[in-house]
A protein has these predicted regions:
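Transmembrane alpha-helices and adjacent helix-loop boundaries
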Residues: 1-148
């Protein structure tokens, strides 16, 4: 029982940490949904100017370890941003680690979500979409009623 009493001494810090974890997870989920949907729609588009960057994004991001991307974006992004601000004569900018974590989680998980969404969209039988067109549904209605 002595092991649990030590946790009570740090309950405020543990609760703050749990809230930061929830903030990071939920914010990262929202960012990853945005990246995932945009990359999915881009990778399925007929225009190569939209398709090729989306495919490159999902392939490259899923191929590089998450921790490497975190370090590259946090430290490399900080360095590049401050090199730019110094060149422009602006003051030094510090990037908040929490916001960097939210962005990196969203950026990385967005690539995985894009492939999951793309697989889901491609799994829809063509007959369902043809039937919706024959029924007279608009492309937007087909997307919301059948695809999504």
């Amino acid at each position: 029982m002595h092991g649990y009493t030590i946790l009570l001494e740090y309950k405020e810090q543990l609760l703050k940490g749990a809230l930061v974890t929830l903030e990071l997870a939920l914010s990262g989920l929202i960012v990853s949904l945005i990246f995932g949907i945009l990359a999915c729609l881009g990778s399925m588009h007929k225009n190569p100017w939209l398709r090729l960057p989306a495919i490159a994004y999902t392939t490259l991001v899923r191929g590089v370890p998450d921790l490497i991307q975190l370090f590259l974006i946090y430290y490399g992004g900080q360095y590049l941003l401050n090199a730019l601000t110094t060149r422009l004569g602006w003051p030094h900018i510090d990037i908040d680690p929490l916001y960097t974590g939210i962005f990196v989680i969203g950026f990385v998980m967005g690539a995985y979500m894009a492939e999951s969404f793309r697989g889901g969209f491609l799994a829809i039988p063509k007959g369902q979409i043809e039937a919706a067109r024959a029924y007279g549904l608009s492309r937007k209605s087909i997307f919301w009623r059948i695809s999504w």
